[in-house]
Design a protein with these regions (language model features):
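Short, glycine-/small-residue-rich phosphate/pyrophosphate-handling segment
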Residues: 94-115
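Acidic/histidine-enriched active-site and ligand-binding environments that engage anionic O-linkages
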Residues: 123-136
Length: 187
């Protein structure tokens, strides 16, 4: 099987993608024909290259690599790839939507408030409802990009400003101490 490992991209998580791509390459090289494919611009520019492979392993992180855009492009061109389909990818990268789906399915998730920034302005949740410590993070990023743990109100504005560098949609989430786990949910 000829496998192309697609890595790079334009998101804030680009460097994480380089590490993932290398790790995947080293893990599967023995039994397969494997080639690294750097995404360093528009995906359409490498369409012919992508069509040379039996399977594209998505080693992209963040942005269009995880939000369904690349997945939809590959499906539109009948290119097999690893990972979730475009709709599941969009939902998974939207933390707020994912949390709402989890709650509807009786899966516990830390409580949260949403802040939407429009033209540099936003409305804060009622300060009496904000508990500390909390986690402030962009709705659509991963790999802790733009994430802050806020211990008290004096740190809140700087955390919102940092998260706003990555998204106009920000979550203030209850902080739960312990080991962070990432899990897949099937079904």
């Amino acid at each position: 099987m000829k496998i192309g490992i697609l890595y790079g991209g334009q998101s804030a998580e680009r460097e994480v993608s380089f590490s993932t791509g290398k790790a995947v390459f080293e893990a599967i090289i023995d039994d397969n024909k494997v080639e690294m494919i750097l995404l360093d611009g528009e995906i359409s520019l490498i369409l012919n290259k992508l069509k040379e492979f039996d399977l594209i392993f998505l080693a992209l992180h963040g942005g269009e690599g995880e939000n369904g855009i690349i997945q939809q492009f590959l499906e539109n061109h009948n290119i097999l790839y690893t990972g979730s389909d475009p709709i599941a990818s969009r939902l998974a990268m939207d933390k707020s939507a994912s949390k709402k789906i989890a709650l509807k399915n009786d899966i516990l998730t830390p409580s949260w408030h949403e802040i939407q920034i429009q033209h540099g302005n936003y409305e804060m949740p009622d300060r009496r409802e904000i508990k500390y410590p909390n986690v402030v993070k962009p709705n659509e990023e991963g790999s802790t990009m733009g994430l802050s743990i806020v211990k008290d109100v004096s740190q809140l504005q700087a955390a919102i400003d940092l998260a706003a560098n990555y998204s106009n949609y920000i979550l203030l989430e209850e902080y739960i101490p312990g080991t962070e786990l990432t899990v897949g949910i099937l079904g």
